[in-house]
Amino acid sequence: YAYPIVENFNPKLILDVGANLGATSMFFAINYPKARIFSFEPTQMNFRWLQKNTEGFKNIIRIKKGAYFKDTNAKIFLDSENGGRNSIYKDWTNSDKYELVELINLGKFLESKNLVKKIDILKIDTEGCEIDILSSIEQHLKNIQVIYLEYHGKNNEEVIMEILSESHVVKQKKAVAQK
């Protein structure tokens, strides 16, 4: 996972929400070695891989929780082909198999750690929870320098663009998917 590197930018705090196996966290750790990186991943198997893949990086803080708009436990349906497509929305996966996971209000988490005014990069890839997560931090968006967000669906795109355009210049990069 490669994201554009911002020139003359030395982030101190990065949030990787939906860290999956840790590829993006490692990308950030390599390119921004002075940054603290909080990596959120709620499912057991993905979290084990996240731990294993990132064990050599001292600046990655792994959190076995998912971000959401409230604190709750929820079913995450486990895609049988790709753990990166696990979702709380059953119809987004190809499986009835699920895992009960802990979800936390991201805004409250950031406030409790006194991090709301210090976020340099926020990356979100959460298979359908993007709007819920943005709503939990909406009042803090203006304090985030760079946001990388993967969203799914035209309806989500419109809502996300509306939320983000109030505080950020939005640049879209269209993904091409192929089976």
Question: Where would I find each of the regions flagged by the language model?
Answer:
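Phosphate/nucleotide-binding beta-alpha loop and adjacent structural elements of enzyme active sites
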Residues: 1-179
